Amino acid sequence: EIMPSLVGSEMCIRDRSKGRYHIVSSEQMKKRPMKDLLVSLEKLGAHIEYDENEYHFPFTIGNTGEYADTVDINVDKSSQFLSALLISAIVMEKNFTINVTGTHGMAYVEMTRLMMKQFGLDVMQDKKNNSFIIPKKAAYESLDYDIEPDVSAACYFYAMSPLLHVKSKVMGVHQNSLQGDVAFLDVLADMGCTISDEADGIVCMPPKNAHIHGGSWDLSTFSDQALTLAAIAPFANAPVGIEGISHIRLQECDRINAIEENLTELGVRVEEIENGLKIYPAERIKPCKIKTYDD
């Protein structure tokens, strides 16, 4: 029995093994949409028996003994599905092709591809046909590897810089990071901060005039920072548009709704736009209890 955290690649590998594995999860993970990945695994030869709701945890996974060498995957709900297939493709016995539909989160997929290359596995990418090819008998090489700091978490500290008008530095974070969330620093620069990449980490200095600039940004390639930007948006001198984030409704909770509800409780004016939110400057912030939605 397995309790998953980042379960996608784990399931793909189990699909190719000879055993049967029962995978359970937290109540919150049971709500996460998994259908696109699980359908792809079934087409690759997985046999899945669901304990409760179809295409959701918990379930038992084994294999039918029949294997395909091509699979289609849609990434509109989560790019993790594609990353899982890429990472685990080395267990396939033939050249393996993954055909991709959708464009969400491809910066995270590129991070996966580059890390695989660092471990000696160069995934071929056919951009014309939007597919990835992993050669048969591919294997990872062992090596000593320095893991980058979590840029998603680092962004919280960088966001404090314009709010508190202080210098913020996170050790080990650099502009050449594989992680797409490093693009959030470009947003802070647009808002008036000064960003400098020093030898031991990136420094964020607050706006010189203490004014945080408003504007509109497409966060489709680093959507984890939508909540971070939403938290500082009420303190900007003009409205802040957060675009390209419609897919975050399908994560551990409806994160667009979570942003809107909590900011409204704080006295902030928020409007839903086609694929995101517009947040207006707040004259004052009202005390309230912040709902976390078990996220």
Regions found by a protein language model. Give the residues of each.
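C-terminal structural cap/anchor segments
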Residues: T221-I279
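Secondary-structure capping and domain/repeat boundary segments
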Residues: S9, S17, S79-S83, I87, ...
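Short, recurring structural edge motifs at helix starts
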Residues: S26-M29, V71-N74, V100-T103, D144-D146, ...
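Single conserved hydrophobic/aromatic residue that forms the stacking wall/gate
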Residues: E1-G8, I13
